[in-house]
Swiss-Prot record:
Subunit structure: Homodimer.
Gene (UniProt): truA
Disulphide bond pairs: none
UniProt keyword Transit peptide present: no
InterPro entries named among the record's database cross-references: PsdUridine_synth_cat_dom_sf, PsdUridine_synth_TruA, PsdUridine_synth_TruA_a/b_dom, PsdUridine_synth_TruA_C, TruA/RsuA/RluB/E/F_N
Species the sequence originates in: Ruegeria pomeroyi (strain ATCC 700808 / DSM 15171 / DSS-3)
Protein name: tRNA pseudouridine synthase A
Length: 262
């Protein structure tokens, strides 16, 4: 059966997460329902990452197997038609090898987290940022973030229900960026690794916020990491503000990615 990769963008607010759940709205369920309107189902799609409730997607990648030989552009157009009015869009589609897998073929995942610093309630960015009413020291946060780079046992920074076989991961990037947006001053976190533990990024951000607020010193983050104890973690920040921004593969999958790489 022909296999297709889909690049997916979605607003996570109305969904119970990516993964299909009985009697609850999910991004996976929305796409599988749209696929069933193109070809008889049932259809099951696999994704590079299963984002939690309220987490958004800018560059999620999934794959599906279809019986018909679709032109990728027409496939994306047809899916987008049937996905309306839900806040889910297929921004690209590509034919891939039958053994290509959205999750297992991926070599890296990149997340973005937006933290807005202002006292007035966010209106246009409501649900798209984590908002705090105080300023944060981005330099101190970066100093603490640097201590987390590399290969470590991240037991402190994973949820108690994490199903990963090992807490050891390699963190390739954790960059703290101060940005002046139209809504106000933001801190943006750029986080990149081959794979992540459950709630790892939100645990990082919640802990680093404490550093930026002056409640923790950067060295306290090192102590928390070395404790290998969930109780040593700072607060876990809320899901709004977190985006799965990009998934990387050994070779570019979509036409726009191939053009950028050449």
């Amino acid at each position: 059966m022909p296999r297709y990769a889909l690049k997916v963008e979605y607003l996570g607010t109305p969904f119970a997460g990516w993964q299909r759940q009985k009697d609850l709205p999910s991004v996976q369920g929305a796409i599988e329902t749209a696929l069933a309107r193109l070809e008889p189902g049932p259809h099951t799609i696999a994704a590079a990452g299963r984002t939690d409730a309220g987490v958004h997607g800018l560059g999620q990648v999934a794959h599906c197997d279809l019986t018909r030989d679709w032109d990728p552009f027409r496939l994306s157009e047809a899916l987008n038609y049937h996905l309306k009015p839900q806040p889910v869009a297929i921004t690209a589609a590509a034919r891939v090898a039958e053994d290509w897998h959205a999750r297992f073929s991926a070599t890296e995942r990149q997340y973005l987290f937006r933290l807005l610093m202002r006292r007035a309630p966010a209106t246009h960015d409501a649900g798209l940022v984590w908002q705090v009413g105080h300023r944060l020291d981005a330099r101190a946060m970066q100093a603490a973030a640097d201590l987390l780079l590399g290969r470590h046992d991240f037991t402190t920074f994973r949820s108690s229900i994490c199903q990963a076989a090992s807490p050891v991961k390699t963190l390739d990037e954790l960059r703290v960026e101060a940005v002046e947006s139209f809504s106000g001053p933001e801190i943006r976190f750029h986080v990149r690794a081959r794979s992540f533990l459950h709630n790892q990024v939100r645990s990082f951000v919640g802990t680093l916020e404490r550093v930026g607020a002056g409640a923790w010193a950067p060295e306290d983050v090192r102590s928390a990491l070395e404790a290998r104890d969930r109780a040593a973690c700072g607060p876990v920040c809320p899901p709004q503000g977190l985006y799965l921004a990009r998934v990387g593969y050994p070779e570019p999958v979509f036409a726009a990615d191939r053009s950028a790489a050449s």
